[in-house]
């Protein structure tokens, strides 16, 4: 299996990310890129996925998006990307991170496997329950 290379996205990646990131506006995408809040995964120089994050309550790093192309899933890249993100934040002095997943998404099992604990949830607009996960760096 080819090795995943992870790098911090920059504003130079705007055109690339615009082709894939459809959950946020172009303006927010530019802000995320300029604030170094997107990690880009590549294999042999080919884009395969990304992780986007923000801050919950302006304090706790919160992973908003982890996505890999369909044909790149199941190769351990998601685990490697999340571990890279966690280690980056630990080195910056953070003691915990958060994320979420709808109760009907497979991602909830992925996060539990990585040591995340469900700490609550909420429902919006009749969507399935959104489960909030936390991982502490003890």
Region spans (language model):
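Conserved GNAT acetyl-CoA-binding A-motif
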Residues: 89-102
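Conserved acetyl-CoA pyrophosphate-binding loop and the N-cap/start of the following alpha-helix
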Residues: 72, 76-84
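Short acidic/glycine-enriched loop/turn segments that link adjacent beta-strands
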Residues: 35, 59, 104-105, 125-129
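Acetyl-CoA-dependent GNAT
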Residues: 2-64, 69
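Active-site beta-strand termini and strand-to-loop segments that position acidic
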Residues: 42-44, 134-137
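Conserved catalytic-core motifs of GNAT/GCN5-like acyltransferases
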Residues: 98-100, 112, 117-132
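A short, internal acetyl-CoA/4′-phosphopantetheine-binding micro-motif in the GNAT/acyltransferase core
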Residues: 66-73, 102
């Amino acid at each position: 299996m080819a090795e995943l290379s992870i790098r911090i996205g920059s504003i130079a990646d705007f055109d690339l990310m615009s082709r894939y990131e459809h959950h946020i506006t172009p303006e927010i995408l530019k802000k995320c890129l300029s604030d170094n809040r997107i990690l880009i995964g590549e294999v042999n120089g080919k884009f395969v996925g990304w992780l986007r994050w923000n801050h919950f309550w302006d304090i706790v790093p919160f992973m908003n998006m982890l996505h890999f192309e369909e044909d790149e899933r199941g190769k351990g890249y998601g685990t490697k990307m999340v571990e890279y993100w966690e280690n980056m934040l630990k080195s910056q002095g953070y003691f915990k991170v958060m994320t979420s997943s709808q109760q009907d998404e497979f991602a909830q099992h992925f996060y539990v496997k990585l040591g995340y604990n469900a700490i609550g949830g909420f429902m919006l607009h009749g969507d399935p329950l959104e489960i909030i996960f936390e991982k502490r760096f003890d």
